């Protein structure tokens, strides 16, 4: 109550910010007359003037009014588009590293030009991030005219580009690309063996378009570069026979033994999408597997030798009970293709992990492809948090404002519309069954069609869009279906979705990024006429005028019919996705309307609100075909959506907390990897490693401060001879001296190791040997880091079980992850020292050959896949990765390498700073020991 009272007096935080930015808008507008009088050359010359002022120490904030005024004037001259005042406010929000929520049709692409131009003046690069290649290319080509006019270079970063093209794109002042491509380039840069092979610069400033889609919807899905693993095809086929023989248990057993309606072998948790074997299920599975010869008679599934089988049992169960054809995946050309649950898009090239994809392939009786091992991976949460400054734009961010602030430290500012919105959002209509719902949808579409009103129908899945298309065909209503398979065709259809009588069915976010203009898109057709060289100039002008006149008539006709009508056939579990669908209507003050049609069979209603609404319908004795349309029901649904959103936020936050553990370790490893790449001479590092390893070996047999009776000299001699190529007569030294100490033995062994090392260096020369050492070190760090991440992954999969032992799983994970990391650092030192001390070299040529073999072995990318939503594997630049990066590994290099690493991009850890691993020690006394 107090908050509401204070808001009335002082306004909300959002209103105060907008008011504050409005003052700067007035300053920019005051400069307009002065800037308008400049010639094109003088306007272009402003860019050089600004650059010099920035180089002299002037801040970008101080430069903002002038830079925005120049950019607006250039846009007016080049693009024939002048930024509105609210667009200037949007530009300021982005420049100050916040999220701008702008309604559909308010010109987000144009808004981005203001902060992008201003920040590009610093010369450190600006990334404009979009959701697909089509939008990246469209926006880059469209806005490049403006940036080039102002003297700035523009690059496009697309999948499938050559290595040199990528380097050129990143060297530009402004780089357009997709979130996936920026992330994958980052990972590939972390797998290089030469600094020249990198493509990215330091991560400076990113403007993310459709920021909610990238930073929230896709936050739970990491980018993964993977290679082929061991083949378990036969096992998946045999396990596929198990789920049909098991029965589902209905009801959960309570403490008093009640609650089970029907006993069975497994239980399903639809909310968390998990399946669990019951006690009887375990016994039945063990009996069946023993009959099939997969485990020994009377053996438990949890016996050490059978633990891997459990993984296959659960993968098969999940494939049969939680993943459905035409809802979660489709079978296309003999392959299982995932359907994105948020967008309804087919995601060719993306595969489920943990053997689930292979289990689904076995279920559908298609060819089972080999399991993959992760070679490199990063989440968008950790990638985008590495930019020095991050900003985003979307039509719907306010519902997720808390998460943006909590996870990314980004404030959301709602930008006022240029014209007041006129869209009418009608109340939801809820029917008992899906059939009644679809009948009502068809009736509504027919009414719109008859009065010439365009309709956009949003569905949550491909299956539903095809069902609706079938019903519309039966009703004799012509329509277009968008299943989000081809972005360019998608954009063309969506652009024409505002024509009279046009019916368009689209999965939730198909065609996002393209405006629906009432009356159709005359500009595109005019561009085709303009580009046709066969048409004379006067004829072109006549045709374009005729086109615009026709559009004007159609535009008014559609406005009179009520504008674009949006129909939602189901509520999404996120209010934001529903708002995105609604937001397609009523752009820039146009009329429009929206309505959602629901049924009690919808997953959201069934799981969260079904019983309550059904009891209301039963009490009201609703006849068949009659709908409930009441505020209380709509509020009940929104309450259910809020519950789901809160649960999803908790999941994402928890994932991030776990991922932060490996992320902190990454910072250490990749900082050291970069220092290795950039160091001219790593002799000191190798020497420190050698001394550390030799000390450990000697102390194992001759403990510090011990007496002769406690020593095991023969074993020490054998260990040094077999493992370290050091043939020393230590027993003779002990026999000859009555007062020799443990420290003197250590000194003798260390001196011998140093002499052996120096002899090898003298044989081939310091430069050649350093190159060999660097290759050994990089290959060893990469391989053991991947194995470490695989170990972390296995640790994480079972860590929740510690909760049953009254232990905090997160704390346990941090503790054990730290122990694993310390063990990995020791293993790196041991491995590198062993290779360097054991290598037998006669000439520099031999050494060069050995270094090449190491790099070739680690640089051989076999059957590499790039996995993430919307990232087609066929477009991934596999060949040029192998050529350009000479990195990564074959299948014998297990595990994964997460995150980035260019010297300037990860925060430097000072020697006396606290170690990022969380041990509480200084970095130099903890993980800094490696370097």
UniProtKB/Swiss-Prot annotation:
Keywords: ATP-binding, Cell inner membrane, Cell membrane, Cytoplasm, Membrane, Metal-binding, Nucleotide-binding, Protein transport, Translocase, Translocation, Transport, Zinc. It holds the Pfam family SEC-C. Its EC number is 7.4.2.8. Part of the Sec protein translocase complex. Interacts with the SecYEG preprotein conducting channel. Has a central role in coupling the hydrolysis of ATP to the transfer of proteins into and across the cell membrane, serving both as a receptor for the preprotein-SecB complex and as an ATP-driven molecular motor driving the stepwise translocation of polypeptide chains across the membrane. It comes from Burkholderia ambifaria (strain MC40-6). It catalyses: ATP + H2O + cellular proteinSide 1 = ADP + phosphate + cellular proteinSide 2. Monomer and homodimer. Part of the essential Sec protein translocation apparatus which comprises SecA, SecYEG and auxiliary proteins SecDF-YajC and YidC. PANTHER family: CHLOROPLAST PROTEIN-TRANSPORTING ATPASE, SECA INNER MEMBRANE COMPONENT OF SEC PROTEIN SECRETION SYSTEM. Its cofactor is Zn(2+). Belongs to the SecA family. Its main location: membrane. One of its GO terms (biological process) is protein import. ATP binds at residues 87, 105-109, 515. GO terms for cellular component: cell envelope Sec protein transport complex; cytosol; plasma membrane. PROSITE patterns: SECA, SECA_MOTOR_DEAD. It is found in: Cell inner membrane; Cytoplasm. It is a peripheral membrane protein. May bind 1 zinc ion per subunit. The keyword Metal-binding applies. GO terms for molecular function: ATP binding; metal ion binding; protein-exporting ATPase activity. This is Protein translocase subunit SecA. Zn(2+) binds at residues 915, 917, 926-927.
């Amino acid at each position: 109550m107090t908050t509401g009272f204070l808001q009335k007096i002082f306004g909300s935080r959002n209103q105060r910010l907008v008011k504050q930015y409005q003052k700067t808008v007035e300053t920019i507008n005051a400069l307009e007359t002065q800037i308008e009088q400049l010639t094109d050359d003088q306007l272009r010359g402003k860019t050089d003037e600004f650059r010099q002022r920035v180089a002299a120490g002037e801040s970008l904030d101080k430069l903002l009014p002038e830079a925005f005024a120049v950019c607006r004037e250039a846009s007016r001259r080049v693009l024939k588009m002048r930024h509105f005042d609210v667009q200037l406010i949007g530009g300021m929000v982005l420049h100050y590293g916040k999220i701008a929520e702008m309604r559909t049709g308010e010109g987000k692409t144009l808004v981005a030009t203001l902060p992008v131009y201003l920040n590009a003046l610093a010369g450190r690069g600006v990334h404009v991030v979009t959701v697909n290649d089509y939008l990246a290319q469209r926006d880059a080509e469209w806005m490049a005219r403006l940036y080039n006019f102002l003297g700035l270079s523009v690059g496009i970063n697309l999948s499938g580009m050559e290595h040199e093209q990528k380097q050129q794109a990143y060297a530009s002042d402004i780089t357009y690309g997709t979130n996936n491509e920026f992330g994958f380039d980052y990972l590939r840069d972390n797998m290089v063996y030469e600094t020249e092979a990198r493509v990215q610069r330091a991560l400076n400033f990113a403007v993310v378009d459709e920021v909610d889609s990238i930073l929230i919807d896709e936050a739970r899905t990491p980018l993964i570069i993977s290679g082929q693993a061991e083949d378990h095809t036969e096992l998946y086929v045999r396990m596929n026979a198990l789920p049909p023989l098991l029965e589902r248990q209905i009801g959960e057993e309570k403490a008093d033994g009640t609650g089970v309606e029907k006993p069975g072998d497994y239980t399903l948790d639809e909310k968390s999408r998990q399946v669990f074997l019951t006690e009887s299920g375990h016994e039945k599975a063990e009996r069946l597997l023993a009959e099939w010869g997969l485990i020994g008679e009377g053996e438990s599934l949890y016996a050490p030798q059978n633990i891997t089988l459990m993984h296959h049992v659960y993968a098969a169960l999940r494939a049969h009970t939680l993943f459905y054809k035409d809802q979660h995946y489709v079978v296309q050309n003999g392959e299982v293709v995932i359907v994105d649950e948020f967008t309804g898009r087919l995601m060719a090239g993306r595969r489920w992990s943990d053997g689930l994809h292979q289990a689904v392939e076995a279920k559908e009786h298609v060819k089972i492809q080999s399991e993959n091992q992760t070679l490199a991976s990063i989440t968008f949460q950790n990638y985008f948090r590495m930019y020095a400054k991050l900003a985003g734009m979307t039509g719907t961010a306010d519902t997720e404002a808390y998460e943006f602030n909590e996870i990314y430290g980004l404030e959301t500012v709602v930008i006022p519309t240029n014209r007041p919105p006129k869209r009418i959002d009608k109340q939801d209509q809820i029917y008992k069954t899906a059939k009644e719902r679809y009948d009502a949808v068809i009736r509504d579409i027919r009414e719109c069609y008859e009065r010439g009103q365009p309709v956009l129908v949003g569905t949550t899945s491909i299956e539903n869009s095809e069902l609706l298309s079938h019903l519309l065909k039966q009703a004799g209503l012509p329509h277009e279906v968008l299943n989000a398979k081809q972005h360019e065709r998608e954009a063309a259809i969506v652009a024409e979705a505002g024509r009279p009588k046009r019916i368009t069915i689209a999965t939730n976010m198909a065609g996002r990024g393209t405006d629906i203009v009432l009356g159709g898109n005359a500009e595109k057709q005019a561009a085709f006429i303009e580009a046709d060289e066969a048409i004379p100039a006067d004829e072109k002008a006549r045709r374009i005028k005729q086109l615009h006149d026709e559009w004007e008539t159609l535009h008014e006709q559609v406005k009179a019919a009520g504008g674009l009508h949006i129909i939602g056939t189901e509520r999404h579990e996120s209010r934001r996705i529903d708002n995105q669908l609604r937001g397609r209507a009523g752009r820039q003050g146009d009329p429009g309307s929206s309505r959602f049609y629901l049924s009690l069979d919808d997953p959201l209603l069934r799981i969260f609100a079904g019983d309550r609404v059904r009891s209301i319908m039963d009490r009201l004795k609703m006849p068949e075909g009659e709908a409930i349309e009441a505020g209380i029901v709509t509020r009940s649904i929104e309450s259910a959506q809020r519950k789901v959103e809160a649960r999803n936020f908790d999941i994402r936050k928890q994932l991030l907390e776990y991922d932060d553990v490996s992320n902190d370790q990454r910072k250490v490893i990749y900082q050291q990897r970069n220092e290795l790449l950039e160091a001219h001479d790593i002799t000191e590092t190798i020497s420190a490693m050698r001394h550390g390893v030799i000390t450990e070996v000697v102390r194992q047999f001759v403990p510090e401060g011990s007496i002769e009776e406690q020593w095991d000299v023969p074993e020490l001699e054998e260990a040094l001879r077999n493992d370290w190529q050091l043939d020393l007569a230590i027993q003779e030294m002990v026999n000859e001296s009555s007062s020799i100490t443990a420290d003197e033995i250590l000194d003798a062994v260390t001196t011998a190791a140093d002499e052996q090392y120096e002899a090898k260096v003298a044989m081939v020369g310091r430069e050649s040997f350093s190159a060999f050492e660097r290759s050994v070190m990089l290959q060893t760090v990469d391989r053991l880091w991947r194995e470490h991440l695989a170990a972390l992954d296995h640790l994480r999969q079972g860590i929740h079980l510690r909760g049953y032992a009254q232990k905090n799983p997160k704390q346990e994970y941090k503790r054990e992850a730290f122990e694993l990391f310390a063990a990995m650092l020791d293993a790196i030192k041991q491995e590198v020292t062993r290779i360097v001390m054991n290598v037998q070299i006669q000439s520099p040529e031999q050494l060069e050959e050995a270094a090449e073999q190491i790099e070739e072995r680690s640089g051989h990318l076999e059957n590499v896949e790039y996995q993430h939503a919307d990232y087609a594997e066929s477009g991934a630049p596999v060949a040029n990765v192998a050529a350009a990066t000479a990195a990564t590994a074959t299948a014998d290099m297990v595990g994964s390498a997460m995150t980035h690493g260019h010297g300037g991009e990860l925060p430097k850890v000072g020697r006396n700073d606290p170690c990022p691993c969380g041990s509480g020690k200084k970095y130099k006394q903890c993980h800094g020991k490696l370097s």
